[in-house]
């Protein structure tokens, strides 16, 4: 940042962050804007601070790819992002919304970068492995699909093996074409799918 002419101390971090250090930063009069990710408590603290704030809890960040994109670069960047730490970080790419006229090219380039494309039947099989039904917390509440915590952060190779697909170590993530309402789009999986 300094080499590019930016100001000193524009980005700072706390060596050992705690709720107390977060509260100090939030309440410090010299801090004019806050940005944080975390659980609902952290986000609530930021948004109720009275300061400009950007807060995000659990996320399922989308990527939008249109026909102005450098498709080979977009594919590489998406795969690199969603496979970093097996897609655990809430900032990593979780799903792509792609214009039809570039979808085929994007998929082909994703395959070149370590993705494995599964079909609709395999998507259904995979749902039964990586998702479970929640137990309703209140009377009348409907169960919904939630992540199977046994598969959080697992390698794509191990996940695919559960549905009978054996791949090499070069496969870093699993991709599929699906509808917006499909559970993989609506649920933060925290695994390379």
Name these PLM-found stretches.
Residues 182-185:
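Short acidic/glycine-rich loop or secondary-structure boundary segments that cap or lie
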Residues 187-193:
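Conserved glycine-rich beta-strand-loop-beta hairpin in the small C-terminal domain of fold type I
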Residues 1-73:
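Rossmann-like NAD(P) dinucleotide-binding subdomain of oxidoreductase/dehydrogenase enzymes
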Residues 43-180:
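ALDH superfamily catalytic-core signature
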Residues 2-6, 164-168, 187:
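Short, conserved catalytic or adaptor-binding loops enriched in Gly and charged residues
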């Amino acid at each position: 940042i300094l080499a590019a002419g930016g100001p000193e101390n524009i980005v700072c971090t706390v060596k050992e962050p705690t709720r107390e250090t977060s509260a100090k930063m939030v309440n410090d009069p010299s801090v004019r804007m806050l940005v944080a990710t975390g659980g609902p408590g952290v986000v609530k603290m930021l948004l109720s601070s009275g300061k400009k704030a950007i807060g995000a809890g659990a996320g399922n960040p989308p990527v939008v790819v249109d026909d102005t994109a450098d498709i080979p670069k977009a594919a590489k960047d998406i795969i690199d992002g969603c496979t970093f730490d097996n897609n655990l970080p809430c900032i990593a790419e979780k799903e792509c919304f792609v214009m039809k006229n570039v979808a085929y090219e994007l998929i082909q380039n994703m395959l070149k970068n370590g993705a494995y494309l599964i079909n609709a039947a395999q998507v259904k099989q995979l749902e039964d492995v990586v998702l479970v039904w929640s137990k309703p917390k209140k009377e009348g509440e409907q169960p919904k699909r939630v992540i199977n915590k046994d598969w959080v952060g697992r390698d794509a190779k191990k996940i695919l093996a559960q549905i009978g697909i054996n791949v090499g170590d070069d496969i870093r993530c699993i991709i599929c074409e699906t509808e917006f309402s499909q559970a993989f789009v609506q649920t933060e999986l925290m695994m390379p799918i």
